[in-house]
Each structure stands twice: as C-alpha cells, then as structure tokens.
A protein has these predicted regions:
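N-terminal export/targeting leaders of redox proteins
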Residues: 1-98, 207, 214, 218-226
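Short sequence/structural segments immediately N-terminal
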Residues: 56-65, 69, 89-95, 101, ...
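Electrostatic cytochrome c docking/interface patches
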Residues: 84-113, 129, 219-263
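Membrane-proximal soluble helical/coiled-coil segments
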Residues: 84-175
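Sequence context surrounding c-type heme c attachment/ligation sites in exported
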Residues: 102-119, 253-268, 278-285, 302, ...
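Short pre-active-site segment immediately N-terminal to redox-active cysteine/selenocysteine motifs
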Residues: 111-120, 125, 150, 178, ...
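Surface-exposed intrinsically disordered loops and tails
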Residues: 125-146, 212-245, 257-258, 274-288, ...
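Extracytoplasmic electron-transfer domains, predominantly the class I c-type cytochrome c fold
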Residues: 135-205, 278-353
Length: 353
C-alpha cells in the first residue's frame, strides 16, 4: 500500500513539473514570434529591464516566496523519499515474488489446466508425491513394459538440494525416467524466466521449517531449520511399523527403504535398482546412485563420522568426499530432513551391506 502511494505521489509531482515546463516553453516561444521589428527593440538583451522599485518590490517578494515554497518541498520531499523508499522496494520485491509464484503455479499445473503437468506426476499442486506412467525398456531383451514410476514429493526438495542443483535437474531432467529435460539448454521447452518462476512456486510449497536461525525470516527455505518434529516423529512411526510388521529387520533398513513421499525421504529410490517402479532388485546394489553393497561404503568412508557428515550435507559439485570421491551435486543432503538418530541408523545398516 505504501509503495503504491509513493509511486502515485511521484507520478503526480512529475506531471506537475512537466506541465509547468511545457506551459513556460509554449508561452515563451509564442511571445518571441509575436512581432517583427528592429533588433534594438526586440533583442532580449537590449530591452529595458524592470526598474529598482519594481525589482525590489512585489516581484522580489514573489520570487523569494516561490523559492521558499520550493525549499520547503525539497526539505519535506527528500526525507519522505528516504523514509518511504525502503518500503517501496520491499513492496515491489514482494509483488514480484507473488507474481512469479502465480506464473510458476500455472506452469506446475496439469496439462488439462494449461501447465506442463508437474502436478500430474508429483502428487497435486502441493507435490506430496505421486506416480507417473512410463514405458520401461529392458536393455537385455529389448522388451518394453508399462510401469508406474514413483515421482517423489517436491515439498521438501529445497531441504535436500540448493537452488542451483534444483535448476540443473529441471534443465536436464532425469533422462532414464519419466522426468524429461525442461530447460532450453537441455532440449526442453522452458526459458530461463519460466524456470525462475517455476522454482519460485516450488519454494512456496515447501513444508515450513522449525528452529530457523536468527535473521532467517523465511521458514520455507531457512538454511538452519529442519523438518518439523511432528513429521520426523511420523517417519519414526512408519519405520517402527515396518519393523513390527516383519517387513524389515531393523529401523535402519526400514528408513533406507521408506516409501513415504514416494521415496523422497529414502535411499533405496536411487541406490536400489527397480525400486522406483515397484520391482526392486538387490537392496543398495546401485542404480542412479552408486553400489553400496560388498562393504564399498566402508572403503569410501573409513571413518563412520565422515559418512554421517556426507549423508547430512550431500555432495557439492567438484568437491572431494570420502577417500577418493568427487561430488557431482546429485547426492542430496538429508541433514534437515532426518534426525541425527535416523541418519545414524541408516549408516549402520548401509555399512553392513
């Protein structure tokens, strides 16, 4: 509201000043061509000027009065501008974010509603996880079968990935899956601004975080926050239920294979072949993520604490991890999603494979 008022006042002042100058120019030009005569009579620098009585009388008073009025305007207007400009900028920024979120929502919509069908695969406009039909090619036999590929929840994607990593995934997709490239650079249909608005919408649907640090005003993306305790307790309950039902032997195994959010919280989604379409092979044998079996994690991470830190933080492009690993940004960080105990239990299970 303040931003709109400030803008209106600025336009009003601009209009008044412009009108004044235009009027002055018009009258001056019109007066200059009224009559023809000798240079002595018409040249501006040869005309008789006002006498002292007139100059030091009403005319001087009028000019000084105008000067005082202009000075008052400057004295008031500049401080007001200084006070109101931050609010105007904040309002403009918020308006831009709201506009981008609205545009991004249109892109996220189903195809039937004019979007690119992100919501159709990922579980609605809140992206809680869903499924996508996919023709799966068997590289050995050449046969094709129709499967339902688990499309992960996206309402926690910024818990695990940075904005740059999310943008990369959107641009290039996951070409072995139903997720196609969406950015022009990757061969998709979206330009940079469309990707920016799509990311803005995805940020707006993140689960609000708890325990954000001082000065971190946005609970949707605050760096030091974590998944609400209620949701973390729900993950514990699901793991306990799976163990009690005999589906898994340990909580670590249950957490590794957690199906909640279409695998958005699990490890098996990337590290177990076939898990994403409901036909899992050997647990942890490797798919999009590398093979975790045969003690390979113990070779990569001689120190268990290093492996815990890696799972919490994920990999960063070009940075070293473990013994001889170099990050690509593909490994997400789970430190803001899972509790310390949950990560510890997963590590103990994985190191036993």
């Amino acid at each position: 509201m303040i931003a709109l008022t400030s803008t209106s006042i600025a336009w009003l002042l601009f209009t008044v000043i412009l009108t004044g100058w235009a009027t002055y120019a018009f009258l001056n030009l019109r007066q200059s061509r009224d009559e023809l005569g000798s240079e002595i009579e018409l040249a501006a620098n040869r005309k008789k000027y006002y006498d002292d009585e007139e100059l030091e009388g009403s005319r001087l008073t009028r000019v000084l009065g105008i000067g005082v009025i202009l000075m008052v305007i400057i004295v008031i207007a500049l401080p007001l501008y200084w006070i109101l400009e931050p609010a105007r900028l904040t309002g403009a920024t918020e308006a831009k974010e709201e506009r981008f979120i609205e545009w991004g929502a249109g892109l996220f919509e189903t195809t039937a509603n004019g979007g690119f069908n992100c919501s159709g695969c990922h579980g609605g406009m809140n992206a809680v996880g869903g499924e996508a039909p996919f023709p799966l090619l068997d590289a050995t036999t050449g046969s094709i079968k129709a499967v339902n590929w688990k499309a992960p929840a996206l309402n926690t994607v910024f818990y695990k990935f940075s904005e740059e990593e999310v943008r990369y995934i959107l641009v290039y997709g996951r070409t072995f899956s139903p997720m196609p490239p969406w950015g022009v650079e990757g061969g998709g249909p979206m330009n940079d601004q469309q990707l920016e608005t799509l990311i803005a919408y995805m940020k707006s649907i993140q689960i609000p975080r708890e325990d954000c640090g001082e000065g971190e005003d946005d609970s949707l993306t605050c760096p030091s926050g974590h998944l609400p305790a209620e949701d973390q307790a729900n993950i514990d309950a699901l793991a306990d239920q799976a163990v009690a039902g005999g589906e898994y032997a340990t909580r670590g195994e249950a957490l590794f294979n957690l199906e909640f959010g279409s695998g958005s919280y699990s490890c098996a989604r990337c590290h177990t072949p076939g898990w994403s379409w409901g036909d899992p092979g050997v647990t942890g044998q490797g798919a999009f993520g590398w093979n975790l079996t045969g003690g390979s994690t113990n070779d990569h991470f001689a120190n268990e604490a290093d492996m815990i830190a890696f799972i919490k933080n994920g990999s960063n492009q070009g940075q070293k991890y473990g013994t001889q690993g170099q990050g690509s940004g593909r490994m997400p960080g789970f430190g803001q999603l899972l509790t310390e105990q949950q990560i510890q239990e997963i590590v103990e299970y994985v190191r036993s494979l």
